[in-house]
């Protein structure tokens, strides 16, 4: 049997059920051709308002792009939105009170947008309504936001958050993998869904309190293989408390991966958790 909490999955059934890392070369060629042909054969249409999109093949109009709420004042560790009037928390190297008290297992989170209208419409469409075409648009959006920030030291691999088998059977796909495929095309970083897997089905995290989320996800992941990489990015659609990606990062760190980033399209604000009083510079010690 596989060992939980960082062990390798060892049963034949688990091995055969594992997700594949590399897509066939033909699929990559077809995807690339379709992506280029779409902008030539069809006018891009905004996925939100139906107006004219932006060339080439970007399905959002400038007006709807402007309506997206950016996560510009956030903790530099977990990307939790902070209250206050500072325009850019990253320039001030602020960490939230939760990260000061209990640093996450990952090194930093990149969540360029807030989980709010109209972006939540696109994410819910991908996640719950089978609109996998939204993954291409979301990947383009994400790549636009972070490309310059990772230019000097991009991660070597993208690792999507594994979906519980029950939810995978219900949906027929993993939205984190769909988003990861788009990021792989946009940023030329390999997507590897065969590095880590869930060892058991967990309850839906939605609706659970922070402590309950940590208990629910504890020891729910195990390594399928040890990648030849020292810097990776975990990919997901939305971060709420960060419990899932934090548990994944714990297992990946135990496997020897030195630097772990978390990439998500959006960060859901946790009302009342972080205020100006809990936002402190990274080099400031917590008062005893």
Please give the residue ranges for each predicted region:
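Glycine-rich phosphate/pyrophosphate-handling loop used in enzymes and phosphotransfer proteins
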Residues: 2-236, 240-288
């Amino acid at each position: 049997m596989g060992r939980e909490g960082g062990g390798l999955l060892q049963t034949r059934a688990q091995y055969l059920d594992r997700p594949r890392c590399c897509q066939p070369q033909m699929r990559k060629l077809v995807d690339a051709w379709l992506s280029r042909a779409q902008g030539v054969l069809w006018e891009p249409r905004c996925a939100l308002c139906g107006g004219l999109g932006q060339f080439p093949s970007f399905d959002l109009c400038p007006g709807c792009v402007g309506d997206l709420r950016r996560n510009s004042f956030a903790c530099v560790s977990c990307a939790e939105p902070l209250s206050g009037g500072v325009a850019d928390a990253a320039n001030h190297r602020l960490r939230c009170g939760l990260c000061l008290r209990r640093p996450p297992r990952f090194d930093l989170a990149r969540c360029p947008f807030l989980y709010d209208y109209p972006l939540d419409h696109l994410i819910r469409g991908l996640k719950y309504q089978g609109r996998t075409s939204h993954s291409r648009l979301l990947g383009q959006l994400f790549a636009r936001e972070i490309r310059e920030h990772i230019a000097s030291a991009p991660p070597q691999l993208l690792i999507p958050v594994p979906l519980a088998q029950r939810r995978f059977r219900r949906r027929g796909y993993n939205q984190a993998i769909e988003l990861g495929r788009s990021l792989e095309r946009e940023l030329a970083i390999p997507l590897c869904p065969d590095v880590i897997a869930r060892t058991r089905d967990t309850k839906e995290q939605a609706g659970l309190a922070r402590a309950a989320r940590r208990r629910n996800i504890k020891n729910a992941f195990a390594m399928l293989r040890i990648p030849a990489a020292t810097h990776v990015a975990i990919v997901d659609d939305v971060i709420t408390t960060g419990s899932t990606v934090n548990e994944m990062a714990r297992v990946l760190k135990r496997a020897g991966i030195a630097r772990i980033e978390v990439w998500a399209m959006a960060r859901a604000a946790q009302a009342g958790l972080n205020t100006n009083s809990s936002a402190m510079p990274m080099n400031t010690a917590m008062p005893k």
